[in-house]
Amino acid sequence: SSLAFVSNPDIPNIPTQLGATHAGNPGANSAAGTMQHLAFKVKDHTELMAMRDRLRSKGVPVLGPLDHGMCVSMYFAGLENLSLELSYSAEPINNELWIDPEVVELAGISAEELAGYKNPNTFSDSHGSIGQPAINNSTGPHMTNYPPGVYEKSMQIPDEIALNMVESKPPVSP
């Protein structure tokens, strides 16, 4: 898989507020809908240490490794106040040991919901045949901050047309 950090010329003009727009560290808060921190999985302790050395060799301070019991992690800052984590687990996380009943109660999660989280329904790949849900009746999260009507129109574009709507050639030719 890939991860892209996208920027545009207007982003530097948007104020950053630690504790609201960004956490700034892996233990601090940020507003709902923002990214508190992003964790990347590495294979094992050897790979974790290799990544730590690689980061430190580039002048990036790294906290850890820290053994959390369910995983071993290390934390560092990314560009633009992103808080990043690298971690591995030697064994699958035992949800009977690591799901705190007090937190479940405080979050208002019912026994039925919890069972669904612990054992989600299996998903059968439909090989791209599932259509777009009706935007006005969809229960899933929605993208926002579009001019009025643009999101609704965009979500009505057939997939086969959307596939070729954007520039797909690299900026440099061989």
Regions of interest found by a model, annotated:
Residues 68-72:
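Short acidic/glycine-enriched loop/turn segments that link adjacent beta-strands
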Residues 63-67:
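Short beta-strand-to-loop elements that line the ligand-binding cleft
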